[in-house]
Structure formats: structure tokens, C-alpha cells
Curated annotation (Swiss-Prot):
This is dCTP deaminase. Keywords: Hydrolase, Nucleotide metabolism, Nucleotide-binding. DCTP binds at R110, S111, S112, L113, A114, R115, D128, V136, L137, E138, Y171, K178, Q182. GO terms for molecular function: dCTP deaminase activity; nucleotide binding. GO terms for biological process: dUMP biosynthetic process; dUTP biosynthetic process; nucleobase-containing small molecule interconversion. It comes from Pasteurella multocida (strain Pm70).
Length: 194
């Protein structure tokens, strides 16, 4: 069952779901809560790697990933990050999210941004039960013009569903959880897959 706005407010008030900083109640609508853009970004830098062999030896994949991803880019509160047509970038939500083991979250982009060609998440929009940390966004500009993205702008909306029970292996308790407690735009850690 997906939570409605009054349930989202109650779950936030009771500490069952936590968003830090907590959005005001006017950011909770129908069945979603707005989330804002943080100030941490990563981009693909100019590189000479012809490809990334996703099923190759872990050390090779790790070295290839390291060669193509930038260091973390932090921008000021009043600055803009420009995403050009055809570019992919990673960013984070301003809010850190904490979910219990019996609730799953979903991130959706905003229709108004999609109509300009901005995809907020390429495929990863599920927030696992037991998640704790900021949400990394996989931005892609499929439009024709560069887009100026600024910290604190509303970038998407979260919705929540109650599971049929408590997950036996929530994200926060898994030893192999690659993105546990992430607070910045963490690059792919596919080389850590088992």
C-alpha cells in the first residue's frame, strides 16, 4: 500500500521515516514528498578508455571507472551546475533519507523537468528498505539546450510503500551494501559486485 500525504506526515512526525533536513508539510502532496537538489556532483571526464568491460577482472573494472569519473564537484548554494545535451552526471538530493526495514521508497522525476529533457534517474529509482543516506541521482539531458541546475531546487518526489513484512536483509544491515550511508555523489561501484 502506498502512503498518502497524511500518513507521510505522521510517519515523519513519529520518526518512522526520516528526511534530514525535514521538508515542510507544504512539500507533501497527495502521495509524494518533494526532494531538493544537493550540491555534490560527478561527471565523466575526458578519457581515452575505449570502453568499460563490466564483466572483466575487478581490478581492471575499478581502474577503468577511476579513469573516467571526475572527483566530487561541490558547488555553492547560489551557483549553477550546467548539464549539456547528451551528458550524464551524478548528483545527490539535499535531503538524507532513512527508511525502516518494512518500507520501500520510490523516486520520481518532475514532469516539468522531463518536458525540458531532464531525466533525474536513468534506471535506479528504488530506495531499499533499511536505506540510510542521500539519494544519488543519475541525471541525463536528452533535450536540445544546456540546463542550469541549482542546489535547493525541487528535483523530484519520493513515495513510500509498506511491505508485507519486515525485510530479513534490509540495506543497512547488509555487509556488501556498496552505497551504505552515502552523503555525496558516489561513482559506480560495480567492481564490488559479488
Amino acid at each position: 500500500m502506498r502512503l498518502c500525504d497524511t500518513d507521510i506526515e505522521r510517519y515523519l512526525d513519529d520518526g518512522i521515516i526520516a528526511l534530514t533536513p525535514r521538508p515542510s508539510n507544504d512539500k507533501i502532496n497527495g502521495a509524494t514528498i518533494d526532494v531538493r537538489l544537493g550540491n555534490s556532483f560527478r561527471v565523466f571526464r575526458e578519457h581515452s578508455a575505449p570502453y568499460i568491460d563490466l564483466s572483466g577482472p575487478k581490478e581492471q573494472v575499478s581502474a577503468q571507472l577511476e579513469s573516467v569519473m571526475s572527483e566530487e564537484i561541490l558547488i555553492g548554494e547560489n551557483d549553477a551546475f550546467f548539464l549539456h545535451p547528451g551528458e550524464l552526471a551524478l548528483a545527490t538530493t539535499l535531503e538524507s533519507v532513512k527508511l525502516p526495514a518494512n518500507i520501500i521508497g520510490w523516486l520520481d522525476g518532475r514532469s516539468s523537468l522531463a518536458r525540458l529533457g531532464l531525466m533525474v534517474h536513468v534506471t535506479a529509482h528504488r530506495i531499499d528498505p533499511g536505506w540510510e543516506g542521500r539519494i544519488v541521482l543519475e541525471f541525463f539531458n536528452s533535450g536540445k539546450l544546456p540546463l542550469a541546475l541549482r542546489p535547493n531546487m525541487v528535483i523530484g518526489a519520493l513515495s513510500f510503500e509498506i511491505l508485507s513484512g519486515y525485510a530479513a536483509r534490509p540495506y543497512s544491515s547488509r555487509k556488501n551494501a556498496k552505497y551504505k550511508n552515502q552523503q555525496s555523489a558516489v561513482a559506480s561501484r560495480i567492481d564490488e559486485d559479488k
